[in-house]
Amino acid sequence: MSDYKDTLNLPETGFPMRGNLANREPEMLKRWYKEDLYGEIRKAKKGKKSFVLHDGPPYANGDIHIGHALNKILKDIIIKSKTLSGFDAPYIPGWDCHGLPIELMVEKKKGKPGQKISAAEFREECRKYAAGQVEGQKESFKRLGIMGEWDKPYRTMDFGTEANIIRSLGKIADKGHLLKGFKPVHWCTDCGSALAEAEVEYKDKVSPSIDVKFTAADEAALLEKFTLAEGHAGQGEISIVIWTTTPWTLPANRAVCLRDDLEYVLIQVEANGDQPAQRIVVASELAKDVMDRAGIEHFHNLGFATGADLELSQFNHPFYNFTVPAVLGDHVTTDSGTGVVHTAPGHGQEDFVVGKKYNLEIANPVGSNGVYLPDTELFAGQHVFKANDSVLEVLKEKGALLHHHAYEHSYPHCWRHKTPIIFRATPQWFISMDQAGLRAKALESTKSVEWMPEWGQSRIEGMIEGRPEWCISRQRTWGVPIALFVHKETSELHPDSPALIEKVAKLVEEKGIQAWWDVDAAELMGAEDADKYEKVLDTLDVWFDSGVTHFSVVDSREEYNFPNEERTHSADLYLEGSDQHRGWFQSSLISSIAMKDEAPYKQVLTHGFVVDGNGRKMSKSIGNVVAPKDVTNKLGADILRLWVASTDYTNEVAVSDEILKRSADAYRRIRNTARFFLANLNGFNPETDLVPAEEMVALDRWAVGRAQAAQEEIVKAYGEYNTHGVTQRLMQFCSIEMGSFYLDVIKDRQYTAKQGSHAQRSCQTALYYIVEALVRWMAPIMSFTADEIWNEMPGERDTFVFTGEWFEGLFGLADDEELSNEFWTEIQSVRGAVNKLLEDARKEKTIGGALQAEVTLYADDALAAKINKLEDELRFVLITSAAVVKPLSDKSDTAQATDVEGLYVEVAATEAEKCDRCWHHTPDVGTIEGHEKICGRCVSNIDGEGEVRKFA
């Protein structure tokens, strides 16, 4: 026989080397949906212990971006890993569908409600627009391989969800947490509406920084409050000086605020040219700063008083004809300014609190469009930000401006319009943080939640401690109505509000939110009451919509009804970006405590923001945006999924073409490992060909044991949501334990052993067990590729890998086995040392390849005893044609030291002939008649009983 190719067990598989994912994945998706993969998973897991990851809803506007992809892929990985861990883990994706961005898009096309289009028609157009946006985003998410209830997602605009949002409001009101108040709220003049805390972002803004004088209304009374040296009361007008960066709020000033324990100084300012002498009052600590910036060089102190001493002293408003009192507040600091705070209760939270304490007027001279109202003296009709200059002019005319300069500082802006906002007192509905102890309960509840990373707890606690009342009302058209009736004269809620809310909710369940605006009050409460009560026409903050989904979705959907369990929380896990401590995590927690006295989640996991390779934010202007669609079209979704899983997502997550290329390289290594397994299982039938564990070749049992060890670590990492740890362990297993050692060693046996022999079947048994485990490890991350592998694997199996659980057929070497794990670790060290010297010999042209080498290992007694356990099979482990072990004392002059203690190695070129079939060089090549070009081992593997392997 001259051609022995047909006698080899050559690898063969339909699993291609190239993934070609961009083209192949869409075909797999079609099959998943045609065969109802998600439904099959649900059937397989019915009755198992539940796990609920509740989806924070993205906003239904625009294409998905890379941050959306990161978030949804992480969720999908967790859901799939929980499923493989034996949990029933349904996933209902959601969308946030009400609110201003959608209104603005519809306004562009249809005009403002009440002008070119009725409010009812406008709402319907908003509903249509949001539905279209949901469909577009849904297809993008499905393309990423994310499994869920895509045919029945939750949308906050679904009639049933809208009804449950209204019911949530009713529950919160019933528990005593609802409050109506005239309070300053974040107000966007472009939106014409109040903003939630989470809708405010801070950016640098240049404002006028001014020091303003309020003259004393009664100088003699004021002087009595200072400790003055006798006869040294000074001369000139007396003023107290405030500092502000919002001159436009001065028309609403109703007090100057001091701190009770601060020391204030009365300063004599000398006359200077045409400037007469004057006396001013500021905090002692800041006096020098004030004098320096005002350019005042000649001054001295006259006397001192505490803030408490000066309480209720009267001062003249700088340009209106009334006086304002000095009041006390804890918010006054000496970080900057004058130690005296301009107080406009209608334009600031702290000012409002102080104003209530001192019964000050809550003046609000500014309209919803940011323009002073017609009766505003001096400034009527001016926009507040343009009025700053006018206010400065008036202050100069009145001699009240001590100093001004341009000042850059962090200032609140509308997250949508990116424009500066104002604080403006308006009648609004609030969830009170304190009137029924909500703040304290919310803070207490954070202790029962597992926050990942741990700093999430202190972050959200700080935010809850410092947050104002939650303003839940909006003056918008497209939103869930605040479905309440209030008395026309007293503004009190209707005494039968709970029953009325349920009636409205039932109407909304049937007809949507338009039912609220259409219904006649008399239909709900009778004509007599209808004359006394009126509808609230405000809509709910969209953060309320999404915040109550623990009730409106999780507690309400049939998919989350687990009849055999008593669940203590609505959800097991919330997973969103770290910005949601001030957004969805907080709105969910507050509403859940208000409604149910418990947190809505057991665990909260956060991920960082996506940045480019240089750590910069994604920006169209910079040109560094990575769009998910571009990645899936070019590389495939599994590459994107592997990138997500490989990152330490608790910090900022970097992405770029170069980073994705590295993910693609890692993917190829994993794919090639899987392909080796599949190709070498060619002709293997697990029903008939499995070798019992105790009869397997030692190295094969070691390999299965390495898979068992890897699986323990991988499953643990999945359970801890440590996807980074999963991918690292997966790569280590594929590249190091398998690729660099086991798969390299077994090639000779797998390819050349007698077909169907124990030597071959033992190896295939190991490969089979390992790939059964490997495909499951991959499935949550590289879902498409795992499905592809699954369909190429031998043996009867379920249609999909995703309906099963972690492979339980793995086993390892016993600790007391002669060829234990420790033994194989040492052998790998020996092999590594030999390989280094073989590589040197190759470079020096002593040999061509390793099979052209014969190696002699000179080892100390202990090491030699271990190596000799492999007997003649040592050469197969070293992949050399011959390998002998000799005592260290016999080492030749040409033997070289190695990194392994007690080991020297001599490499020599073999003089034996090369076997045409196995490529080993052995003395018996050509000695057997009829097989002149192959070795005796190969002859036995072709015509005889086949070689016997015990160790490798």
From Swiss-Prot:
Q: Where is this motif: 'KMSKS' region?
A: 617-621
Subcellular localization, as worded in the UniProt entry: Cytoplasm
What is one GO biological process annotated to this record? Answer: isoleucyl-tRNA aminoacylation
So where does Zn(2+) get bound? 915, 918, 935, 938
**Positions of ATP binding:** 620
* UniProt-listed CDD domains: Anticodon_Ia_Ile_BEm, IleRS_core
What's one GO MF term for it? Answer: ATP binding
Q: How is the cofactor bound?
A: Binds 1 zinc ion per subunit.
Task: Give me the Gene Ontology terms describing cellular component.
Answer: cytosol
Per the annotation, the residue ranges of the short sequence motif 'HIGH' region are 58-68
Q: Which UniProt keywords apply?
A: Aminoacyl-tRNA synthetase, ATP-binding, Cytoplasm, Ligase, Metal-binding, Nucleotide-binding, Protein biosynthesis, Zinc
Q: Which cofactor does it need?
A: Zn(2+)
* Signal peptide extent: none
Q: What does the record give as the reaction this protein catalyses?
A: tRNA(Ile) + L-isoleucine + ATP = L-isoleucyl-tRNA(Ile) + AMP + diphosphate
- Chain residues that bind L-isoleucyl-5'-AMP: 576
Where on the tree of life does the source sit, at the highest rank?
Answer: Bacteria
Q: What is its EC number?
A: 6.1.1.5
The top EC class is: ligase
Q: Which NCBIfam families match?
A: ileS (TIGR00392)
**Subunit-level organization:** Monomer.
Copy the domain comment. Answer: IleRS has two distinct active sites: one for aminoacylation and one for editing. The misactivated valine is translocated from the active site to the editing site, which sterically excludes the correctly activated isoleucine. The single editing site contains two valyl binding pockets, one specific for each substrate (Val-AMP or Val-tRNA(Ile)).
Which PANTHER family does the entry link to?
Answer: ISOLEUCINE--TRNA LIGASE, MITOCHONDRIAL, SOLEUCYL-TRNA SYNTHETASE
Functional summary from the UniProt entry: Catalyzes the attachment of isoleucine to tRNA(Ile). As IleRS can inadvertently accommodate and process structurally similar amino acids such as valine, to avoid such errors it has two additional distinct tRNA(Ile)-dependent editing activities. One activity is designated as 'pretransfer' editing and involves the hydrolysis of activated Val-AMP. The other activity is designated 'posttransfer' editing and involves deacylation of mischarged Val-tRNA(Ile).
UniProt lists the family membership as follows: Belongs to the class-I aminoacyl-tRNA synthetase family. IleS type 1 subfamily.
Q: What is this protein called?
A: Isoleucine--tRNA ligase
Taxonomic source organism: Vibrio atlanticus (strain LGP32)
